[in-house]
């Protein structure tokens, strides 16, 4: 069969119409060095700071150092199969992570990828890891309380929604336990929690996730884990990834609590990266912008204005001190960035005072405005009383001839210390705290043996719950103290039937 010339020309025209003249231009460079989570490459003259680049094996990196002849890149993942001479190309994008409701209840790595074996996370929403913090006019002053369920914090150093409260102390003084108890207490509080574990042992994180799961707290919690065996870029990025996930909820009018456990390890990872990138070292070999590393992260926690939906993100950054030295470089930096700090004292911890909160050095700069009226009334002078008790106690060791007023102060102080002790994973609702602290500050515990204080507290709560539950209800609904006569009557009625042990103090 002969092919007609018209058919041939029609086919050629058809093919020409389909011909795509668009060119894909990619800027490709060459890797000149790779090691310890960092690569250097030439040929990426137009790369942007923080831009994602892609290596030949599909691994991504982030451009950090933009020099005249080469670019310093931090590698986001394993770097064992990246070789000198490999190609690396620009993507024109900045790093983004998956965000949204689908992440709740999951454990993810510093790239937002699931690591809990529960399958992929089906979300099509992403947010940039690095964003500008809300400005002054986009914020509102902190006014709503964030109840931690820990008496010593809610009474002495209250935290408000949108605040940044530093938890600082030596290793093994109960920092993470404070965070876990606070997370457990957010049940039914309309709060989403993001727990960012930076450089924590994987076995420890696993145990914490199991605790949260057993207590039903994973229903509102996202865990971001960057383990100690992961490359330094992952430890550096994990807090920003957690903040991006939190911002998605905050900008949608929800309330978020984010725990960074702990930022000392992030600073160490950043120091490692900076030294390998050959940035000039400063004090304690940290780079000059280590303050900015933490300030740009913590400024992202905010209470948004009503125009932006009134959402909030409360940050609890952790810093580990060496032998209680809060005047080291990173601790002083973070203290100056945050709105107060809870200082955990190793001596108190080993003396059995747990949580080991040092009332003298702990402070909350904005949380007082967020405290409910009932708590303000019962805990007004508690922090000062406790600090003066510590001073008196050390003074009283030198002599026994103390006047009756001093002895009464010491006796009240011992009972205050005892009442503020709390077992692990047992956060206390604020209405229970108010009644217990009311009993303390109004002298109802002055004649109760110190050894009986914890039992007195538990039995008092049970008694009020059974016989005068309207008192608890009134505190919850009005946020104020109920009628003092009713409160006094309930405590006196309970006390009349309380059987104290006979052991002397």
Swiss-Prot record:
Q: Which residues bind ATP per the record?
A: 169-176
Q: Tell me the keywords, alphabetical order.
A: ATP synthesis, ATP-binding, Cell membrane, CF(1), Hydrogen ion transport, Ion transport, Membrane, Nucleotide-binding, Translocase, Transport
Main subcellular location: membrane
UniProt catalytic activity? ATP + H2O + 4 H(+)(in) = ADP + phosphate + 5 H(+)(out)
- Which stretch is the leader sequence? none
Under InterPro entries, the record lists:
ATP_synth_asu-like_sf, ATP_synth_asu_C, ATP_synth_asu_C_sf, ATP_synth_F1_a_nt-bd_dom, ATP_synth_F1_asu, ATPase_a/bsu_AS, ATPase_F1/V1/A1_a/bsu_N, ATPase_F1/V1/A1_a/bsu_N_sf
Q: Report the family membership.
A: Belongs to the ATPase alpha/beta chains family.
What protein does this entry describe?
ATP synthase subunit alpha
- Record organism: Leuconostoc mesenteroides subsp. mesenteroides (strain ATCC 8293 / DSM 20343 / BCRC 11652 / CCM 1803 / JCM 6124 / NCDO 523 / NBRC 100496 / NCIMB 8023 / NCTC 12954 / NRRL B-1118 / 37Y)
| Record gene name | atpA
